Amino acid sequence: MAMEIFTVGRGQEGYPERLMPFADMPSRLFVRGALPADEQKTAAIVGARICTAYGKSQAAFFAQVLAANGVAVISGLACGSDAAAHEGALRGKGKTFAVLGCGVDICYPKQNYPLMRRMLENGGG
């Protein structure tokens, strides 16, 4: 899957306005896909990587409801709660975005590659 990677620096057009008030925010973001629009309502859903079935179901449920009501979901693309939240947002026909602990040129964990692909195809990042 080819998806252009780009960078946006603090103070440049495209850098998220909601991050500007914080002095310790990154000076540069590396992006694959898209960033949420400044006017887009967002909610973060995070949790354990090794979690119960109930935990996964709740992450997916809340993400689906939020997405169905126009709220973009942000999580980390890790196994467990994060992946469940992204899946739920996609089921809710919404956009979902990942904040990664690795480079945007790889998918970690590899088993979430199909999920990452669907996120990008759906206009997320």
Regions found by a protein language model. Give the residues of each.
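Glycine-biased, small-residue-rich flexible motifs in mid-sequence functional cores and linkers
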Residues: 2-125
